[in-house]
């Protein structure tokens, strides 16, 4: 792999500095004595990837097994799990190859390793982009189900969902390939950052609007039962906590990665930014943690899915 030192798990494209930007690599004395670098061990990185790989594979298998789950909503959830599976799988593969190379158990020509590195980079980037897209698609699907409940099944049909899924996958592969090919252009990094911010704003606006509507609905029910304040406030607090957790996890897991991209453009040679650059492996680990958390938030809350999952696990034994 085209990797060096403590950051050997950087995507090949992000392990190099764009030619339009000053050199990213900082010497130890440039980053300062107080520079904090969180080391992610090979074992931890590999373990997180394997847990995410197994968990998301179970989600995909469960949805595929049960025909009752072949709906637009579960189609998006299944594709989110598949994206997270690819994110984890590509990082597990890269880590395994690196460990085998370091141990001398694997010998390969530089050209072969470079091609493998490029393939892994494209898979990782495309799965990251598609994962963000499917998180947004799930938010849009839930929004339509609440605000257009009577027309939901005519608006969100399975053929339309499949076309949306196909468009997301094709766009993710195309743009990730362009990203790998033109990683030395600042515009590419800015586009990725803008895309992340757009997904964050989209999810925040939709979920906040859904929470407001749910609170209004609870308030109306409370009025009918003459118990407005306790019910409304309790429901609003629970909804606010749920929303905070959902958006907080998304921002915590994805934010550092895109902060890294932003700082590459804004301050590639600043000592403080250099400290942040040193923790890129941590940022990748956080994205894999998000891949572990996603099924808990979007999939396993379904009683039907949990029941089918038990059947899948029983059959596997």
UniProtKB/Swiss-Prot annotation:
Keywords associated with the record: Cell membrane, Disease variant, G-protein coupled receptor, Glycoprotein, Lipoprotein, Membrane, Palmitate, Receptor, Transducer, Transmembrane, Transmembrane helix
Subunit structure: Interacts with MGRN1, but does not undergo MGRN1-mediated ubiquitination; this interaction competes with GNAS-binding and thus inhibits agonist-induced cAMP production. Interacts with OPN3; the interaction results in a decrease in MC1R-mediated cAMP signaling and ultimately a decrease in melanin production in melanocytes.
Tissue expression per record: Expressed in melanocytes. Expressed in corticoadrenal tissue.
Outcome after substituting residue 40 to T: Correlated with fair hair and light skin; partial loss-of-function
GO annotation terms (biological process): adenylate cyclase-activating G protein-coupled receptor signaling pathway; G protein-coupled receptor signaling pathway, coupled to cyclic nucleotide second messenger; intracellular signal transduction; melanin biosynthetic process; negative regulation of tumor necrosis factor production; phospholipase C-activating G protein-coupled receptor signaling pathway; pigmentation; positive regulation of cAMP/PKA signal transduction
UniProt effect for mutating residue 166 to G: Shows a moderate and not significant decrease of cAMP production to NDP-MSH stimulation; shows a not significant decrease in cAMP production at any concentrations of NDP-MSH stimulation
Membrane topology note: Multi-pass membrane protein
UniProt GO cellular component terms: cytoplasm; plasma membrane
Species of the source: Homo sapiens (Human)
SUPFAM superfamilies: Family A G protein-coupled receptor-like
Family, per entry: Belongs to the G-protein coupled receptor 1 family.
Covalently lipidated residues, kind S-palmitoyl cysteine: 315
Result of changing residue 238 to R: Only minor effect on internalization rate and protein half-life
Pfam families in the record: 7tm_1
Impact reported for residue 122 to M: Correlated with fair hair and light skin; partial loss-of-function
Name of the featured protein: Melanocyte-stimulating hormone receptor
Outcome after substituting residue 155 to T: Probable risk factor for developing melanoma; reduced expression at the cell surface
């Amino acid at each position: 792999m085209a990797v060096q030192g403590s950051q050997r798990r950087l995507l090949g494209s992000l392990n190099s500095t764009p030619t339009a930007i000053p050199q990213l690599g900082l010497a130890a004395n440039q980053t300062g004595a107080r520079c904090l670098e969180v080391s992610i061990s090979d074992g931890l990185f590999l373990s997180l990837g394997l847990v995410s790989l197994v968990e998301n594979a179970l989600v995909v298998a469960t949805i595929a097994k049960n025909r009752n789950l072949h709906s637009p909503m579960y189609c998006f959830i299944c594709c989110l799990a598949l994206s997270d599976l690819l994110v984890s799988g590509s990082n597990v593969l890269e880590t395994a190859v690196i460990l085998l190379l370091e141990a001398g158990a694997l010998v390969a020509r530089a050209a072969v390793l470079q091609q493998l590195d490029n393939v892994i980079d494209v898979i990782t980037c495309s799965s990251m982009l598609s994962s963000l897209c499917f998180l947004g698609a799930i938010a849009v699907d839930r929004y339509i189900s609440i605000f257009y409940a009577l027309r939901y099944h005519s608006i969100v049909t399975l053929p339309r969902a499949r076309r949306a899924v196909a468009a997301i996958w094709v766009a993710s592969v195309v743009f990730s390939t362009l990203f790998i090919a033109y990683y030395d252009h600042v515009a590419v990094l800015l586009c990725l950052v803008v895309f992340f911010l757009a997904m964050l704003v989209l999810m925040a606006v939709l979920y906040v609007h859904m929470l407001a509507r749910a609170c209004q609905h609870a308030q109306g029910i409370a009025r009918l039962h003459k118990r407005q304040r306790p019910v409304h406030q309790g429901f609003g607090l629970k909804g606010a906590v749920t929303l905070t957790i959902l958006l907080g996890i998304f921002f915590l897991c994805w934010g550092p990665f895109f902060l890294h991209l932003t700082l590459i453009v804004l301050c590639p040679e600043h000592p403080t930014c250099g400290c942040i650059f040193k923790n890129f492996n941590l940022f990748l680990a956080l994205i894999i943690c998000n891949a572990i958390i996603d099924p808990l938030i979007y999939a396993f809350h379904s009683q039907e899915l949990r029941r089918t999952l038990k059947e899948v696990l029983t059959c596997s034994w």
